[in-house]
Every structure is written in structure tokens, then in C-alpha cells.
Amino acid sequence: MSTLGKRAGVRRRVRAVATAATATALVAVPLTTLATSASAAPVHVDNPYAGAVQYVNPTWAASVNAAAGRQSADPALAAKMRTVAGQPTAVWMDRISAITGNADGNGLKFHLDNAVAQQKAAGVPLVFNLVIYDLPGRDCFALASNGELPATDAGLARYKSEYIDPIADLLDNPEYESIRIAATIEPDSLPNLTTNISEPACQQAAPYYRQGVKYALDKLHAIPNVYNYIDIGHSGWLGWDSNAGPSATLFAEVAKSTTAGFASIDGFVSDVANTTPLEEPLLSDSSLTINNTPIRSSKFYEWNFDFDEIDYTAHMHRLLVAAGFPSSIGMLVDTSRNGWGGPNRPTSITASTDVNAYVDANRVDRRVHRGAWCNPLGAGIGRFPEATPSGYAASHLDAFVWIKPPGESDGASTDIPNDQGKRFDRMCDPTFVSPKLNNQLTGATPNAPLAGQWFEEQFVTLVKNAYPVIGGTTPVEDLVAPTVPTGLTAGTTTATSVPLSWTASTDNVAVTGYDVYRGTTLVGTTAATSYTVTGLTPATAYSFTVRAKDAAGNVSAASAAAAATTQSGTVTDTTAPSVPAGLTAGTTTTTTVPLSWTASTDNAGGSGVAGYEVLRGTTVVGTTTATSYTVTGLTAGTTYSFSVRAKDVAGNTSAASAAVSATTQTGTVVDTTAPSVPTGLTAGTTTTSSVPLTWTASTDNAGGSGVAGYEVFNGTTRVATVTSTSYTVTGLAADTAYSFTVKAKDVAGNVSAASAAVSARTQAATSGGCTVKYSASSWNTGFTGTVEVKNNGTAALNGWTLGFSFADGQKVSQGWSAEWSQSGTAVTAKNAPWNGTLAAGSSVSIGFNGTHNGTNTAPTAFTLNGVACTLG
């Protein structure tokens, strides 16, 4: 913690005599005696967590204990939950009403009063962890935690007068001056301005983030017993140098904009509400290479050097100091959900020469992607809150804290209407394949409620997967490396290989294997005490070392080096490859015969198989490096004999393979076989006059003329002929049932039997029509559009499609609560899976982000299922 963060002087305030019920059961064991008398003015210390306990939220603890009471079938799990209930967590002020209390919980004064009581019972200083979280345009890149205040001047004014000012006034009350209040300032805000500033919503929010954070720092820093910590994201977000460096610069710019400068910030906090591991014990060296490939280049780490939060906090501390912060600035890590224990946690190194397989097998972080942030399956509770944790000197840690209370949701799995400004983020939908995650499922836990609400299903998993295991059953960590291998010797070399052998190492538990290095590059892993390094260059000198490792991932120092020189590469190869086997002829045409065979091998130390010669009789008709070849230019209705020979790089040729005979087809083949029957015929969302159909493609017989198209039938009437596997039948009557089939036909005119029929009913005509309300908020070249659609008809719409067009070339870039598409100027919004039923008289609200070229005229004509709507 920075000495610059200490106040030059402190105010002495008259403290009112207050009584409060004790909360002994909720307070951890005291660490020291209380440093100051009850009447002393607060002293701003270097590390507020040192020698102090932390506040246990009784409201959250009650939820945890209630969950434990529902685990009567698993007493051990219930006991672990009750242990968790006694741990300190932060109190979140996530909207204005949270200050006085709302349906989601008690107000700030309730918690401060309880903190006073807990400190009195503990007899030592107490840290009250508080989260300031209501910026205008909050969480501009995600949707699940969007807030109540818009990113506008009016929103910023409300943030100051209705949110920060009342909080500061309450914290400045003399009744609470003995509490050390650690305020985490606006999670996700400033990091978004580094990585997501290209998003229109973040561009809109950027000036309000800077001004809002500055205002909060100024107001709270003026209170002597408040300690300001700025959120710095986590290693999987800002760990790359291209993100970390600009972020440190941004934090410094914001600090310098405040009245007190760098002194307004007491520290930084990482991994808030995230699940990035504190440590990756089996991947402790991010510079390690596997088969000459750095492990940080794996798909999971994407060239990021920071594999865990210990790496990241040390990295960020260096950059923050370089940006102007004092070297004593402190760091916090939120360990509430980054334990990653349970049955899927790897406990020993799994060897592999493939870098992705090596990383995936040995990382404790079991997410599909480091960007999977919402209620991730498999996560567990991490280290319990702890002041000044030892062993992490480079990270300059003030404490491990639980900023995100375990059991509180990150966001809803489905779209849940609410008055908190929280929207549905598909990253919280376990059925969503996200392009942000390399087109993988999100891995989110299903059935999640809104962000911040109690999510017991996830809490159960967090407790079960805790690491360290709750209750003291975590195995004692092995920190002792094996002895250094001795006696490393190089045997007789070849032009491309060096055999190595050595004397076995010993370990306090057990040696599990050895890593073999060529220079500084890891070239192999083995459980034996010998290894042959291959793929070397002839007549080249090399130096080799070996390291021993154990199941806990401890690795010894390198052995003494062994030098060896490969032989020259002038060995004459006079041995032919093996004879190709398994030569087979495939389906012929009138002029071609496809051939395939099993690969040949060359002699040990040989020059290697270079390719194959294909013979028709005794004539070479082709060469290839593959194990297949199609002979062309043949005569129809003729029998041929083929064989294959293998050649190596030195020019040695094998004997010919066993011959295979094949006869080309005659040139007058008549196709009389129809294509296969179309399958999978499905009707999509209908309108009042149309039914969209799709089906699976048919196939034609081998040697047939090929599928030419499909005939679509309404009952027994053919209504269309198409070449694709979809068609929309139009001109239908409203509220009418229809039956459709499809037949396939080939070029020769053969027609298949009809597919299985599919039934569909057109939508009823919406007597009364529909009403649309459209609004847009524009900035620079971007805008956000909101559309409210009302069904004025007398019947529910089971599936709906809204259509409209832009007049000025606007483009939809991202949408929500509907499936959005655009073709030219025409925009279509089809219902999402969860809001497809639109009852008579009810409305649905959808929206999108878009771009414009300076003119953003609102659409004036909308249709709902093909019926024109009126503008509201």
C-alpha cells in the first residue's frame, strides 16, 4: 500500500454513543488487539487488512445457512456450507435503492451498524468490503449487469447526487469512523475502455466512466477511514501486454485527474466476480515450450503470458509502478470462486508433444475458453479471505478477499423482465454457441436468475468443487522437487538422432518422469531413464540436459549438460521401400478408374519414401506422393490391369504391387433409378399467407445422372420446382391447415416417391393489427434502436416476424431479444426461442445496436407476420 495514500492530517469528529447487538458468531478469530482507543480519530494505515478481521454479511450468511438446512441428505456438504457462511464477503451497492434497502436486501446503514457490532465483538480492527457499482452506462460490453443510469449528462448528474453523495455522507458519519472501509470502485468499467472501446455503447459511456470514477475517488478519499481499490479485470482479460500496458496508463490518467492524484487510489483488485485461478500449479512456467512450441501459444492461452492471477497481479504491479504509482501500492485478489477443485482437477502432469493437448490436460481452469465468464460450470470456491498472504512477494498482496459472494448469479440464463436495467446476455445461456468463445457453447450453469440474485444450484457446485477443500481434507501440498539427474551420457549418434541415458533421481514422494532439453528447448518427456532425441541435423553439435519432476509438478534443476555431434548426412541409401499393399480399384466411369493402396515404408536410416508410380500393365501412367490415384483417359467397356511401385528419395524403386483388374463402364449407361426420398421435411414459422419449408438433400445412385432438383406439393398439387433444399409456399389462406410433401428428381427425369408429409397452419389474420413504437439514441456514427411491438389482434401469435426498412443505409450490428438479420435496407427480427408467443393485447420489447453515416431517419413502415402495423 502506498505511503502516499496516508492522509497528512485527519479530522477529529464527535462520535455519538451507539449501541449495537453483537455478532460474535459471524466474526473470524482475532488477529491482534485493537490498535486505537474507542475515541481515537481514524488513522489511515498502509494495508487496511493487516491485523484486522473482515465484515461477515448476515443477510448473505442467512442464505447460505438456509441452503445448508436443505442438505439433510448430505450432512458433510451441509457442514461445509455452514463453514462458508462464516466467511466475510463484500456488500454491493448496485443501484440507488440499495443504499436505503430494497427487495433484494438491507441498506448500507444496516450493514455498517452490524460492522460496528462485529468489530466490537472481535476486539480488533474490522475491514468493511464495499462495492461501488452504478456508473452511467454500466458494463457497456456485456448485458447481464447493465445498470439503471444511462450514459448521458443526466445519468452522470444522478450518479453524483443520488448515488455517490448519499453513500459518502453515510460513510462519513462519526459512528463508523473506526471501521476500515475498503471500497472496490466500479468493476469492469475502466478495463472496458481498453479492450472494448470499439463498441458503440462503450464509446458512449467512456467520458462518463472517467468522470464518474474520478468523482467517486474524490468523494471517498476525503473520508479518512475509506480505502479506494480500483478494479483491474483479470489475467484472461487484460493479461496481454497490448492490454495491460494501456490499462496501467489509463489507471494513472484517472488517478492524476483527481484532487489527490495517485494518493486517491489505495490499491487495485483483480478477478472480481471472475473465476480465473489464483495459481496454475502444473503450468507454473508460461515460457515452457513443447516440441519447440511455446505453451502460451495454445488455443486456451492465445499467447498470453499471464496464466493465473498471481502472474497477473505481479505483471500489473510492475506496469502500475512504471506508470507513476508508488512501489508500495497494494493488490487484492477476489478468490471467492476461482478454486477449481473437484474430480476434474488435474493432480499430476500429463505428458504430450501437442501443445494444446498438454495445456488442456494440465490446466486446473476447466472452462472451454478464458472468456467464459457467466456462471461457469465446474468452478469452485477458492482460498478463504486472508490478510497479507505469504509466498507472493512479486504480487504485493494486501489480502485475498471475497468481493463476489459465492452463490450470487452472474446473469440470467434466459430473458427475465426486471426494473433494474439488467438485460439478457447470451453468454449466460448454456445453449448458446458463442463466436467470442471460438464457436463453443458458453459452459454456463442453466436455470440462473438475474445477476446478483441467490443461485443455489451454482452455490452447491461451488462448495463441492472448492479448492482448497473445505473442512481441511485438502492433501498437504508437496513443494519439494526431485534430486537433479546425474550421469547424463550420450550414446552412438546417427545423422539425425542422439540416444541419452542417465541415473534415476529420487523424491520425497515419487519421481514421475523426466523432461529432456536440447539447449533451452523441451524436446521430450519420458518416465524412463533413457531417451533418443530425433529430428536433428547431420554433422551438428548439440547440448542436452535433463530435469526430473514429481506428481505435484515440482521440477528439479537441470542436470550437467552432455554434448554430442550427429554423424554427417552422406550415408548412401541402396535399399528400396517396401512393396505397396492393399491395391484396390473403386467405382469406375466410362473413362476413369480410381485406385488406392496402403503406404510403403523405407528402411531404418533410409532416405524416406518419396512417392509412387502407377502402372497400367507395364506402362507408367502416373506418379503421386499420396496413396490414391485416378487413372484417366481410358476406353469405355474395357478391362485393365493396374499395379503400383514405391520410390524413395535416393531413387530406389520397389517391386510392383499385386495387380488389380478393373473394367470401365460402357458409354451408353441409361439411368433408370430415382434419387432417394427427401427426408427431414420441416415447416418453419408461418405467416397469414405463407409457410417456409426445409428438408435434407436427396442423393442419386452411384453412376447416376445426379439430383437435378425438387418438386414441392401442397396436397396433390405441385406448387414449385426448386434446386435448393428450402422453399416458402405463398398465396395461402389465413388460419388454414395445409399438408406439404417434396419429391426429388434427377437429370434423367427419374422422380422419387414423396417425402413424409408435414402439416402447418397459417397464422390467423390479426384483426386489429399491430402497433409499433420505435426510438433511437444516436451518437457519432452509432445508435441504439428500441422497438416495442404490440399485438392488437384477438388471438395469440405463436411465432412472429417483424419487418421494416432503413432509409439512410443504416446497418444492424448487434441485437437482443430477437434473431436479427438484414438484407440491403430490409431488416427482419424473428422471435427468440423464449418470447415466441405474443398474446392478444400484449407487447414485446426488442432492440439492437447499429451504425449510420450521419443521417439516422427512423423507419416508418413495419409489418408483423406480413400484416402492416401502425406507429404508436
Swiss-Prot record:
One of its GO terms (biological process) is cellulose catabolic process. It catalyses: Hydrolysis of (1->4)-beta-D-glucosidic linkages in cellulose and cellotetraose, releasing cellobiose from the non-reducing ends of the chains. Residues 41-477 are annotated as: Catalytic. Residues 1-40 form the signal peptide. The keyword Disulfide bond applies. The active site is at D188 (proton donor), D410 (nucleophile). It holds the Pfam family Glyco_hydro_6. It comes from the Bacteria. Disulfide bonds join C140-C202, C374-C428, C770-C869. Residues 763-872 form the CBM2 domain. SMART domains: CBD_II, FN3. It is an enzyme of class 3 (hydrolase). Gene3D superfamilies: 1, 4-beta cellobiohydrolase, 2.60.40.290, Immunoglobulins. Residues 484-569, 579-667, 677-765 form the Fibronectin type-III domain. GO terms for molecular function: cellulose 1,4-beta-cellobiosidase activity; polysaccharide binding. This enzyme hydrolyzes 1,4-beta-D-glucosidic linkages of cellulose. Weak activity against carboxymethylcellulose, bacterial microcrystalline cellulose and barley beta-glucan. Also has weak endoglucanase activity. Hydrolyzes glucosidic bonds with inversion of anomeric configuration. Belongs to the glycosyl hydrolase 6 (cellulase B) family. This is Exoglucanase A. It comes from Cellulomonas fimi (strain ATCC 484 / DSM 20113 / JCM 1341 / CCUG 24087 / LMG 16345 / NBRC 15513 / NCIMB 8980 / NCTC 7547 / NRS-133).
